[in-house]
Design a protein with these regions (language model features):
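Compact alpha-helical subdomains of small soluble proteins
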Residues: 67-129
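Hydrophobic helical h-region of N-terminal Sec-dependent signal peptides
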Residues: 13-17
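Short N-proximal segments of mature Sec-exported proteins
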Residues: 30-89
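Secretory pathway export signals and precursors
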Residues: 1, 55-57, 106-107
Length: 129
C-alpha cells in the first residue's frame, strides 16, 4: 500500500481552513457604497477639470494664433463644455487655469499638444487637477 506523501500534513490545514470559514480573502468586505460614490465623484471632478483645461488651452492658442477673436473663442469653449453638461464657470477654476498655463508651451502652431508624453500628462492630471 502506497502512502500519500504529505496527506497527514495537509489534513489539519484543511480542517483549520474549514473551521475558520474559508480563506481569509473570502472574508474581505465589499467596499462601502458611500466611499465608492465619493471616489467616483472625485474622479469625475478631475476628469471635468482635465477636459476644461484642454478646452481652455486650445481656445487660448487659437486666439494667440489669430484664428479666433476672443469673443469667438469664449463662445466656442462654452459650447464645447455645455455639450457635455459642464458649466463654463469651470474655466475660471484656479486649478484649470494653472494647468492650462503649464500646457501652453507644449502646443504647436496648429494648437495641437505635441510636447507631452503620456507619463507627463498623467502626472499633470494627478498633481495639478
Amino acid at each position: 500500500m502506497q502512502s500519500m506523501c504529505g496527506s497527514w500534513r495537509t489534513f489539519p490545514l484543511l480542517i483549520a481552513l474549514l473551521a475558520t470559514g474559508g480563506p481569509v480573502w473570502s472574508q474581505e468586505r465589499a467596499p462601502d457604497p458611500a466611499i465608492s460614490r465619493r471616489v467616483a465623484r472625485l474622479k469625475l471632478a478631475r476628469s471635468i477639470r482635465a477636459f476644461a483645461t484642454a478646452t481652455l488651452v486650445h481656445g487660448e492658442c487659437q486666439v494667440a494664433q489669430g484664428r479666433l477673436e476672443r469673443r469667438q473663442a469664449d463662445q466656442a469653449m462654452a459650447i464645447a463644455l455645455q455639450e457635455l453638461g459642464i458649466s463654463a464657470a469651470v474655466l475660471a477654476n484656479p486649478q484649470v487655469r494653472k494647468a492650462a498655463a503649464m500646457l501652453e508651451n507644449n502646443l504647436d502652431e496648429a494648437c495641437q499638444l505635441t510636447g507631452l508624453d503620456a507619463a507627463a500628462a498623467a502626472k499633470l492630471v494627478n498633481e495639478e487637477l
